[in-house]
Amino acid sequence: MRLLIRFRDVNSLIKYLREELDKLSVTKRRLEEVLGMDAVVDIVELKDDNIGITRVRTTELKWLLNEIDTRIEAISVILEELRGRLGGVNYTGLVLLELEDGIPRRVLLSQPLSLG
């Protein structure tokens, strides 16, 4: 599923991406700590107004660590691309972040762009 998130300018997009990167990094560190314990955890899933609880061993959650790594890499690539192409310039206008299955894929900027 594809989703577009709109931002008022590039700086607000960068701020959002950095916050997401920070949250993912903290989650990854915590998950790595838990994976080393070989413990049992409860996973709470909210779907279609229903709550599901599943109990799994932490060793079965390595796929989640891979998913987090994929998201961290995608965000890092977008941030690096924005730094490389725009430098420190903040463009205003229509700034869209495209997510594909929850993973940031690309940034779309409106034309013509104005300096903010």
Describe every region a protein language model picked out.
Residues 1-34:
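Short, charge/polar-rich alpha-helical segments
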Residues 22, 44, 51:
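Metal/cofactor-centered catalytic core regions of large enzymes
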Residues 11, 108-116:
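Short, surface-exposed, low-complexity cationic segments
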Residues 3, 10, 17, 47-50, ...:
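Amphipathic alpha-helical coiled-coil segments and their boundaries
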Residues 7, 99, 109-111:
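Surface-exposed beta-strand edges and flanking loops
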Residues 25-28, 32-35, 39-42, 46, ...:
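Coiled-coil heptad-register positions
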Residues 58-105:
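Coiled-coil termination/hinge junctions
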